[in-house]
Regions:
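Ser/Thr-rich, Proline-interspersed low-complexity disordered segments
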Residues: 10, 18-56
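Short, solvent-exposed mixed-charge patches
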Residues: 18, 307-308
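Sec-dependent bacterial lipoprotein signal peptides
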Residues: 1-16
Length: 308
Protein backbone atom coordinates (compact mmCIF):
# COMPACT_ATOMS: atom_id res chain seq x y z
CA UNK A 1 0.00 0.00 0.00
CA UNK A 2 2.97 2.32 0.46
CA UNK A 3 4.02 2.38 -3.22
CA UNK A 4 0.63 3.56 -4.62
CA UNK A 5 0.51 6.21 -1.87
CA UNK A 6 3.99 7.50 -2.70
CA UNK A 7 3.17 7.63 -6.43
CA UNK A 8 -0.02 9.59 -5.71
CA UNK A 9 1.87 12.12 -3.60
CA UNK A 10 4.51 12.57 -6.34
CA UNK A 11 1.77 13.29 -8.93
CA UNK A 12 0.09 15.85 -6.65
CA UNK A 13 3.37 17.78 -6.01
CA UNK A 14 4.26 17.71 -9.72
CA UNK A 15 0.85 19.18 -10.69
CA UNK A 16 1.21 21.93 -8.08
CA UNK A 17 4.68 22.83 -9.30
CA UNK A 18 3.46 23.11 -12.89
CA UNK A 19 0.67 25.46 -11.81
CA UNK A 20 3.14 27.74 -10.03
CA UNK A 21 5.60 27.98 -12.92
CA UNK A 22 3.06 28.47 -15.79
CA UNK A 23 2.87 32.18 -16.90
CA UNK A 24 -0.40 33.99 -16.29
CA UNK A 25 -2.20 35.46 -19.30
CA UNK A 26 -0.95 39.03 -20.03
CA UNK A 27 -3.20 41.71 -18.64
CA UNK A 28 -4.69 43.96 -21.31
CA UNK A 29 -2.94 47.35 -21.54
CA UNK A 30 -4.74 50.27 -19.86
CA UNK A 31 -7.00 52.10 -22.22
CA UNK A 32 -6.22 55.79 -22.79
CA UNK A 33 -8.79 58.17 -24.25
CA UNK A 34 -7.60 60.45 -27.02
CA UNK A 35 -7.69 64.05 -25.74
CA UNK A 36 -8.11 66.79 -28.31
CA UNK A 37 -6.28 70.04 -27.44
CA UNK A 38 -8.42 73.00 -26.55
CA UNK A 39 -7.83 76.03 -28.81
CA UNK A 40 -6.87 78.08 -25.78
CA UNK A 41 -4.13 75.59 -24.91
CA UNK A 42 -2.16 76.40 -28.08
CA UNK A 43 1.13 78.21 -27.46
CA UNK A 44 1.01 81.97 -27.78
CA UNK A 45 3.28 81.97 -30.81
CA UNK A 46 0.71 79.97 -32.73
CA UNK A 47 -1.64 82.98 -32.65
CA UNK A 48 0.12 86.09 -34.01
CA UNK A 49 -2.92 88.31 -33.55
CA UNK A 50 -3.10 87.44 -29.87
CA UNK A 51 0.57 88.20 -29.33
CA UNK A 52 0.55 91.41 -31.42
CA UNK A 53 -2.82 93.17 -31.35
CA UNK A 54 -3.58 95.35 -34.34
CA UNK A 55 -2.58 98.98 -33.90
CA UNK A 56 -5.35 101.57 -33.73
CA UNK A 57 -5.25 105.12 -35.06
CA UNK A 58 -4.72 107.50 -32.15
CA UNK A 59 -5.44 110.69 -34.13
CA UNK A 60 -7.85 113.07 -32.39
CA UNK A 61 -10.04 115.54 -34.29
CA UNK A 62 -10.64 118.74 -32.32
CA UNK A 63 -13.72 120.59 -33.58
CA UNK A 64 -14.43 124.16 -32.49
CA UNK A 65 -17.05 126.77 -33.37
CA UNK A 66 -16.67 130.49 -33.86
CA UNK A 67 -18.42 133.69 -34.93
CA UNK A 68 -16.93 137.03 -36.00
CA UNK A 69 -18.87 140.23 -35.31
CA UNK A 70 -17.75 143.05 -37.58
CA UNK A 71 -17.99 146.79 -36.96
CA UNK A 72 -20.82 147.37 -39.47
CA UNK A 73 -24.18 147.46 -37.60
CA UNK A 74 -26.07 145.88 -40.51
CA UNK A 75 -24.34 142.54 -39.85
CA UNK A 76 -24.56 142.57 -36.05
CA UNK A 77 -26.39 139.68 -34.43
CA UNK A 78 -29.67 140.03 -32.62
CA UNK A 79 -28.50 139.60 -29.04
CA UNK A 80 -31.42 137.44 -27.92
CA UNK A 81 -31.28 135.21 -31.00
CA UNK A 82 -27.52 134.85 -30.72
CA UNK A 83 -27.71 133.93 -27.05
CA UNK A 84 -30.37 131.34 -27.84
CA UNK A 85 -28.11 129.91 -30.53
CA UNK A 86 -25.15 129.74 -28.14
CA UNK A 87 -27.33 128.01 -25.56
CA UNK A 88 -28.27 125.38 -28.14
CA UNK A 89 -24.78 124.62 -29.41
CA UNK A 90 -23.20 124.53 -25.97
CA UNK A 91 -25.99 122.23 -24.75
CA UNK A 92 -24.90 119.87 -27.54
CA UNK A 93 -21.42 119.79 -26.02
CA UNK A 94 -19.80 122.17 -28.50
CA UNK A 95 -17.33 124.85 -27.43
CA UNK A 96 -17.74 128.26 -29.08
CA UNK A 97 -15.75 131.46 -29.28
CA UNK A 98 -16.65 134.95 -30.49
CA UNK A 99 -14.40 137.59 -31.99
CA UNK A 100 -15.88 141.10 -31.98
CA UNK A 101 -14.42 144.16 -33.68
CA UNK A 102 -14.13 147.58 -32.06
CA UNK A 103 -17.26 149.00 -33.71
CA UNK A 104 -19.51 146.41 -32.05
CA UNK A 105 -17.73 146.53 -28.70
CA UNK A 106 -18.20 150.31 -28.55
CA UNK A 107 -21.56 150.55 -30.32
CA UNK A 108 -23.76 147.62 -29.19
CA UNK A 109 -25.77 148.72 -26.12
CA UNK A 110 -26.07 145.12 -24.91
CA UNK A 111 -22.46 144.12 -25.55
CA UNK A 112 -21.66 143.63 -21.86
CA UNK A 113 -24.81 141.55 -21.40
CA UNK A 114 -23.89 139.26 -24.30
CA UNK A 115 -20.27 138.91 -23.18
CA UNK A 116 -21.17 137.97 -19.62
CA UNK A 117 -24.09 135.70 -20.50
CA UNK A 118 -22.09 133.86 -23.16
CA UNK A 119 -19.11 133.36 -20.86
CA UNK A 120 -21.49 131.79 -18.36
CA UNK A 121 -22.19 129.20 -21.08
CA UNK A 122 -18.48 128.51 -21.51
CA UNK A 123 -18.04 130.71 -24.59
CA UNK A 124 -14.64 132.36 -25.02
CA UNK A 125 -13.91 135.77 -26.50
CA UNK A 126 -11.15 135.88 -29.11
CA UNK A 127 -9.54 139.05 -30.43
CA UNK A 128 -10.83 139.99 -33.87
CA UNK A 129 -10.06 143.44 -35.27
CA UNK A 130 -9.55 144.67 -38.80
CA UNK A 131 -6.98 147.17 -37.57
CA UNK A 132 -4.03 145.31 -36.03
CA UNK A 133 -3.30 148.16 -33.64
CA UNK A 134 -6.76 147.76 -32.06
CA UNK A 135 -6.20 144.27 -30.63
CA UNK A 136 -5.16 145.39 -27.15
CA UNK A 137 -8.02 147.91 -27.15
CA UNK A 138 -10.52 145.17 -28.01
CA UNK A 139 -9.16 142.99 -25.22
CA UNK A 140 -9.34 145.93 -22.81
CA UNK A 141 -12.96 146.70 -23.71
CA UNK A 142 -13.94 143.06 -23.18
CA UNK A 143 -12.44 143.15 -19.68
CA UNK A 144 -14.22 146.43 -18.94
CA UNK A 145 -17.51 144.70 -19.71
CA UNK A 146 -16.80 141.80 -17.37
CA UNK A 147 -15.28 139.44 -19.92
CA UNK A 148 -12.02 137.54 -20.13
CA UNK A 149 -10.33 137.85 -23.53
CA UNK A 150 -8.12 134.93 -24.51
CA UNK A 151 -4.83 134.82 -26.43
CA UNK A 152 -6.29 134.11 -29.90
CA UNK A 153 -5.77 136.42 -32.87
CA UNK A 154 -8.94 135.44 -34.70
CA UNK A 155 -8.60 136.49 -38.32
CA UNK A 156 -5.77 138.49 -39.85
CA UNK A 157 -4.03 139.45 -43.04
CA UNK A 158 -1.04 137.18 -43.58
CA UNK A 159 1.00 140.28 -44.45
CA UNK A 160 0.50 141.49 -40.85
CA UNK A 161 2.11 138.41 -39.38
CA UNK A 162 5.59 139.83 -38.84
CA UNK A 163 4.20 142.67 -36.69
CA UNK A 164 2.16 140.52 -34.32
CA UNK A 165 3.19 140.86 -30.69
CA UNK A 166 2.11 142.06 -27.25
CA UNK A 167 0.18 145.34 -27.16
CA UNK A 168 -0.77 147.70 -24.35
CA UNK A 169 -3.85 149.92 -24.15
CA UNK A 170 -4.81 152.06 -21.14
CA UNK A 171 -2.26 150.17 -19.06
CA UNK A 172 -3.72 146.79 -20.07
CA UNK A 173 -1.31 144.46 -21.89
CA UNK A 174 -2.60 141.75 -24.16
CA UNK A 175 -0.26 139.00 -25.42
CA UNK A 176 -1.13 136.80 -28.42
CA UNK A 177 -0.24 133.11 -28.46
CA UNK A 178 -2.59 131.52 -31.00
CA UNK A 179 -3.51 132.42 -34.58
CA UNK A 180 -6.74 131.42 -36.28
CA UNK A 181 -7.63 132.32 -39.84
CA UNK A 182 -5.47 134.08 -42.35
CA UNK A 183 -6.17 135.72 -45.66
CA UNK A 184 -3.86 137.00 -48.35
CA UNK A 185 -6.18 139.82 -49.42
CA UNK A 186 -8.93 141.89 -47.76
CA UNK A 187 -12.56 141.01 -48.28
CA UNK A 188 -12.26 137.21 -48.27
CA UNK A 189 -12.32 137.06 -52.05
CA UNK A 190 -12.20 133.60 -53.69
CA UNK A 191 -8.77 132.04 -53.36
CA UNK A 192 -7.59 134.52 -50.73
CA UNK A 193 -8.30 132.64 -47.51
CA UNK A 194 -6.09 129.93 -46.08
CA UNK A 195 -8.60 127.11 -45.63
CA UNK A 196 -6.28 124.42 -44.30
CA UNK A 197 -7.24 122.25 -41.36
CA UNK A 198 -4.72 121.08 -38.76
CA UNK A 199 -2.05 122.89 -36.76
CA UNK A 200 1.47 124.16 -37.27
CA UNK A 201 3.82 126.97 -36.22
CA UNK A 202 4.62 129.53 -38.94
CA UNK A 203 7.83 131.53 -38.73
CA UNK A 204 7.01 134.51 -40.95
CA UNK A 205 4.51 135.93 -43.41
CA UNK A 206 6.64 134.57 -46.24
CA UNK A 207 6.55 131.06 -44.72
CA UNK A 208 3.05 131.22 -43.27
CA UNK A 209 1.99 127.76 -44.41
CA UNK A 210 5.22 126.00 -43.37
CA UNK A 211 5.83 124.55 -39.92
CA UNK A 212 8.89 125.89 -38.13
CA UNK A 213 9.34 125.10 -34.41
CA UNK A 214 11.33 128.32 -34.04
CA UNK A 215 8.17 130.36 -34.51
CA UNK A 216 6.23 131.92 -31.63
CA UNK A 217 2.57 131.37 -32.46
CA UNK A 218 0.45 128.27 -32.95
CA UNK A 219 -1.69 128.42 -36.07
CA UNK A 220 -5.00 126.58 -35.63
CA UNK A 221 -6.46 125.71 -39.02
CA UNK A 222 -10.22 125.94 -39.31
CA UNK A 223 -10.59 124.28 -42.69
CA UNK A 224 -13.48 125.29 -44.93
CA UNK A 225 -15.96 125.51 -42.00
CA UNK A 226 -18.48 123.49 -44.05
CA UNK A 227 -20.33 120.60 -42.42
CA UNK A 228 -19.82 118.20 -45.32
CA UNK A 229 -16.07 118.86 -45.36
CA UNK A 230 -15.98 118.13 -41.65
CA UNK A 231 -17.71 114.83 -42.33
CA UNK A 232 -15.20 113.94 -45.04
CA UNK A 233 -12.29 114.80 -42.75
CA UNK A 234 -13.66 112.64 -39.93
CA UNK A 235 -14.21 109.69 -42.25
CA UNK A 236 -10.68 110.07 -43.63
CA UNK A 237 -9.31 109.85 -40.10
CA UNK A 238 -11.47 106.80 -39.42
CA UNK A 239 -10.05 105.19 -42.57
CA UNK A 240 -6.50 105.75 -41.32
CA UNK A 241 -5.57 108.35 -43.94
CA UNK A 242 -4.02 110.65 -41.31
CA UNK A 243 -1.94 109.66 -38.30
CA UNK A 244 -1.15 113.06 -36.77
CA UNK A 245 -1.87 113.17 -33.03
CA UNK A 246 -4.11 116.25 -33.32
CA UNK A 247 -6.07 117.71 -36.25
CA UNK A 248 -8.30 120.80 -36.04
CA UNK A 249 -11.48 121.91 -37.80
CA UNK A 250 -13.77 124.86 -37.06
CA UNK A 251 -17.42 125.53 -37.82
CA UNK A 252 -18.02 129.22 -38.49
CA UNK A 253 -21.45 130.82 -38.22
CA UNK A 254 -22.36 134.24 -39.59
CA UNK A 255 -23.68 136.56 -36.83
CA UNK A 256 -26.64 138.02 -38.70
CA UNK A 257 -28.01 134.75 -40.14
CA UNK A 258 -26.73 132.26 -37.54
CA UNK A 259 -25.95 129.88 -40.39
CA UNK A 260 -22.68 128.33 -41.50
CA UNK A 261 -20.82 130.91 -43.59
CA UNK A 262 -21.43 130.61 -47.34
CA UNK A 263 -24.10 128.01 -46.64
CA UNK A 264 -27.78 127.58 -45.82
CA UNK A 265 -26.99 125.18 -42.96
CA UNK A 266 -28.48 126.37 -39.69
CA UNK A 267 -28.96 124.98 -36.21
CA UNK A 268 -30.88 121.89 -37.37
CA UNK A 269 -28.07 120.86 -39.68
CA UNK A 270 -25.49 121.62 -37.00
CA UNK A 271 -27.35 119.37 -34.55
CA UNK A 272 -27.31 116.55 -37.11
CA UNK A 273 -23.60 117.13 -37.67
CA UNK A 274 -22.81 116.98 -33.95
CA UNK A 275 -24.76 113.75 -33.57
CA UNK A 276 -22.88 112.21 -36.49
CA UNK A 277 -19.49 113.30 -35.17
CA UNK A 278 -20.27 111.89 -31.73
CA UNK A 279 -20.22 108.42 -33.28
CA UNK A 280 -16.49 108.78 -33.83
CA UNK A 281 -14.49 108.02 -30.66
CA UNK A 282 -11.69 110.36 -31.74
CA UNK A 283 -13.76 113.58 -31.96
CA UNK A 284 -13.31 116.22 -29.26
CA UNK A 285 -15.36 119.41 -28.83
CA UNK A 286 -13.16 122.33 -27.81
CA UNK A 287 -12.64 126.02 -28.49
CA UNK A 288 -9.79 127.39 -30.59
CA UNK A 289 -7.44 128.15 -27.70
CA UNK A 290 -8.00 124.70 -26.15
CA UNK A 291 -7.18 123.12 -29.51
CA UNK A 292 -3.78 124.80 -29.50
CA UNK A 293 -3.15 123.70 -25.93
CA UNK A 294 -4.05 120.09 -26.73
CA UNK A 295 -1.76 120.13 -29.77
CA UNK A 296 1.16 121.36 -27.65
CA UNK A 297 0.50 118.72 -25.00
CA UNK A 298 0.49 116.02 -27.70
CA UNK A 299 3.96 116.94 -28.94
CA UNK A 300 3.33 119.78 -31.42
CA UNK A 301 3.38 117.49 -34.46
CA UNK A 302 2.46 119.61 -37.52
CA UNK A 303 -0.78 118.48 -39.15
CA UNK A 304 -1.62 121.03 -41.85
CA UNK A 305 -4.16 119.54 -44.31
CA UNK A 306 -5.14 121.40 -47.47
CA UNK A 307 -8.91 121.56 -47.93
CA UNK A 308 -9.32 124.03 -50.80
Amino acid sequence: MKRPLIISLILIFTSAACSLTSPSPAAPPPTTEAVSASPTSAPAEASPTAAHPAETNTTLLYISGTTHIESKPQVWPDVDAFLAFLQQVTALGMKWSVGADIGWLEGEPRAAELIQASEALGVQWDIHTHSPQDRAKAAYLITQMGGHPNSVVSGMLVSEFNNIGPQTYQGFTWTPQVLWGGTNCPGHRPGCDDLAAGLWIPLSAEQYTTHNPNGQYIRVGGGTHQLDDGRILAQSIANGQYTYPVISFTLMVAPSTLKIVQSSDGISEIIDFVNEMNRYPFVRWVNIEETAQAWSAAGSVPSRIEME
